[in-house]
Swiss-Prot record:
This is General secretion pathway protein B. The chain crosses the membrane at residues 37-57. It is a single-pass membrane protein. Pfam families: T2SSB (PF16537). GO terms for cellular component: plasma membrane; type II protein secretion system complex. Belongs to the ExeB/OutB/PulB family. Keywords: Cell inner membrane, Cell membrane, Membrane, Transmembrane, Transmembrane helix, Transport.
Amino acid sequence: MSTLLKALRRAEQPQFTPHIPAMGLPVTQEEEQNRRWIWWLLAPLALLMGAGANYGWHLLNNRPIEKTVEVKEVVTPPFVRVEPRPMITRPLPPPLPEPVVRPRVTPNDSAPAANGSQGLAERIMNALNSTPLMEETAPQAQSESQAMPISALPLELKQRVPPLAYGSHVFSSNPAKRAVMLNGREFREGSEVAPGVTLIAIAQDYIILQVAGQNVSLKALQDWRG
């Protein structure tokens, strides 16, 4: 009985058949328009995805190469030029007077005549050599004995002597070779150094000047400032 009731209920219910699209049937216009819109939307999306993939690939594979380079700085020392300084020196002291060498006569008994003539010639030579020295020494010794230091002159006579810059002093046993350099000029014995000032003698360590008839001495290589 129950079995019959179930069969009747099934017969009364509507039967459902699934819709299976037939192959080869024409597609409607509405479905074709929907497909076109889908393709238009997918095309830009595909382009954007391709561009993003390309940018990501280049970003990963084209990273900048970083390399540390050490730069060595060369320091050039400054060039300093040193000029040599001129050396200012005083002239050398005058040479000592040349000694007079007298030959010694040895007696020879075998030739008395020759010894006599040699001794006579020697005496004549000695007399000739000593005569100029004696003539020059006498006035010089007299002037030296009467000379006073130039600093001891009275003020009136000091003003007559100009400033003297002593450059050089040359003394020799030969009076013709004696000379001094004063204020850049060379003077010899008897020369006028300035108006009223005469150089009358050049000794080994000083000179004798005559100022208004008064003899004064000035040390060699010592400047006179006036």
